[in-house]
């Protein structure tokens, strides 16, 4: 009987030890198993088997929330709904659409998190360790982007002085059925294609929530340089097993015959008031800022001067 009791204790311990040795020491799964061992339970092993929702596959964007922005695009000077601070507003006002013709920027990929709102399909694939079968990373690819790795093995983010890229450095973890992604080390880039930008100090958190064949992506940009408070957006995708991510070759050509870098000097952009004039809005309200995000700002708008609407139509 004593030998039977010892076998009941020793065998689970050996099994748990084998599992622990088969995964990297820094992995989330390994840490979960270790906590289960310390508590005298097998909870860690069960967590490894049940903590993830499968997000892999081909997805097509459903831009219901951003149909105007992703159609003809936001007008110059339209910063509605963006919590820009003074520095972010100044950066946006220097924007010149001619920069897209620069050879250095023609093949620039959409940055995180703007790439979620780009047109076309999106592919999520899994990188799995062939021995432990542990999920090492998700890889996300869009029509116009580089491969984006989202590391799931618990590795730390690099130091502040590490290189910044368009996709940054991303790590993920599951909270219930939601994949939560944290991204740092991003290059300065646009958050709306008419000028508003995030700085290279921005930190982006994303929540991927799957409901059957639909995937909701919520993005949260925290930028101490250009934003007064976090900028939050969401976008939807639909699972599409009968599609394939299309090939998108990018060839750089000399489109810009100008001898200058396209930009506007502070206070010298003549087109900034056109949006307010054409839509009958107070110019101050179109400048963005955290205050403009909330419903009670409507009462303040009633006290503002509105420029008479001009008949000129938007391009």
Residue ranges and their predicted role:
Residues 2-4, 23-315:
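Hydrophobic small-molecule pocket/channel-lining residues, especially in calycin-type beta-barrels
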Residues 11-22:
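Bacterial N-terminal signal peptides
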């Amino acid at each position: 009987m004593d030998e039977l009791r010892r076998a009941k204790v020793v065998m689970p311990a050996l099994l748990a030890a084998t599992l622990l040795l088969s995964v990297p020491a820094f992995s989330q799964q390994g840490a979960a198993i270790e906590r289960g061992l310390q508590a005298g339970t097998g909870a860690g092993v069960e967590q490894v088997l049940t903590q993830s929702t499968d997000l892999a596959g081909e997805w097509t964007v459903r831009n219901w929330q951003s149909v105007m922005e992703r159609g003809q695009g936001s007008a110059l000077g339209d910063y509605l709904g963006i919590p820009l601070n003074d520095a972010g507003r100044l950066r946006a006002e220097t924007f010149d659409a001619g920069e897209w013709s620069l050879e250095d920027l023609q093949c620039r990929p959409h940055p995180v998190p703007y790439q979620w709102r780009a047109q076309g399909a999106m592919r999520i694939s899994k990188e799995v360790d062939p021995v432990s079968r542990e999920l090492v990373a998700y890889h996300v690819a869009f029509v116009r982007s580089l491969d984006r790795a989202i590391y799931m093995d618990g590795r730390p983010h690099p130091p502040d002085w590490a290189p910044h890229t368009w996709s940054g450095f991303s790590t993920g973890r599951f909270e219930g059925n939601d994949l939560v992604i944290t991204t740092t080390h991003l290059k300065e880039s646009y958050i709306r294609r008419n000028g508003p930008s995030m700085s290279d100090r921005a930190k982006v958190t994303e929540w991927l929530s799957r409901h059957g064949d639909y995937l909701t992506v919520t993005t949260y940009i925290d930028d101490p340089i250009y934003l007064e408070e976090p900028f939050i957006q969401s976008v939807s995708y639909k699972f599409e097993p009968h599609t394939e991510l299309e090939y998108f070759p990018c060839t750089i050509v000399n489109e810009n015959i100008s001898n200058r870098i396209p930009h506007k000097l502070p206070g010298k952009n003549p087109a900034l008031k056109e949006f307010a004039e054409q839509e009958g809005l107070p110019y101050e309200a179109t400048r963005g800022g955290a205050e403009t995000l909330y419903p009670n700002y409507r009462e303040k708008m009633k006290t503002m001067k509105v420029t008479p609407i001009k008949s000129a139509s938007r391009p």
